[in-house]
Every structure is written in C-alpha cells, then in structure tokens.
Amino acid sequence: FTQICPATRACVPQKDARASSKLDAIGDRLMFRLAYRNFGSHESLVSNYTVKAGGVAGIRWFELRHVTSGVARVFQESTYQPDLIWRWMASAGMDKDGNLAVGFSASSPNIFPQIRYAGRKATDPLNTLAQGERHLFNGTGSQRRTNNRWGDYSGLSIDPVDDTTFWYTNEYYDATSSFNWRTRIGNFHVTGAAELPSLSND
C-alpha cells in the first residue's frame, strides 16, 4: 500500500474550504480497534487503516484468522476506493453471521464531509465489499481550522441484543464553522437488501 499524506497528515479536501482547512487523514495508524469474533470453527480479527489509492484516500480493510494459536494469517484484504471521493476515518465490524461492514467519512472538493458505509456478506467473493456503499448522513458544512482534526475516531459496534445490527457513529457539520461539529448515530444491517439506515439525532 502507499501511505497517505506522508509529508503532512492534513490532506483531505472539503467543499468550500480553504487550502489550510484540509482534514487530517491519520494514515499512520490503525483506525478504531481490532474487532474480534469467535465462530467456533475459526476466530477472526477485522480492522482497517487509511491509504493512498488512485490519488485519493481509500480504506484498506482486512480480516485476520488463526489469531490466538499458531501463526496469524491474512484471510482477506482489499482497498476500498471506487471513485475519486476521499474515504477515511473508518471503523470495521463483523456480525454473528460473518457479515462485515466498514463505516467511514467521505469528502472531496465537491462535497461536504459525509458519513457512509459499505459491506459484504459472508458468502460474497473474498476481498470485496460486494454489497456496495450507502449514505448514512450527508453533512452540509465544512470544518475550518481546529488543527485539521476530524473524527478521532469513528466507531462501529454490533448490537448485543440481535448480534446482527451494526451501530455507527461519526462526525459531520451542518454549517461551515471552526468548531461546531455534530455527531450522528445510525444503524443498519448487511443483508443484501436495499435497506435504508435508521438514524438518531445528535
């Protein structure tokens, strides 16, 4: 993979933002935490980090297996970067059926920072987020100054009641400003159906 923003961590563009207001990609570390699953037949860890792909930021996600005995190995991995939108500040998780989702921020010179997610069913071809991408919430403003930080970090968790609902939270702005960020919480399933996410107000 190619490191994103090796000279300066702040390189993610936003709509209607000054050049000095590019956002921090934080491409030098894993995002969120490794999510662990024990399926009986195997154990998995999933996580991600931000990389440079196609001239923009993309999500490098992966699943490790044999994580508690023997030599851990990469079971699947891929860089998710389907177009020229910058995607970063992601969080990965896996439900009880082995379906995987990645929530993340998305931005470009033409859009305000947005909250999106993509996923794969356990039966999908390896190394793909074959269920595609959906918008959880579209911001309507950009962040100015505040040391270029963004998210720190986003969070994706599985509902302990049904073990299939993904709950995701991330940052957005409803108006361009230097400090008044908002937080959005939403939930969704990776089912293959064209399901709209459920949202909670911040």
Predicted regions and their residues:
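Residue-level detector of functionally pivotal "anchor" positions at catalytic/ligand-binding pockets or at interdomain
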Residues: 192-202
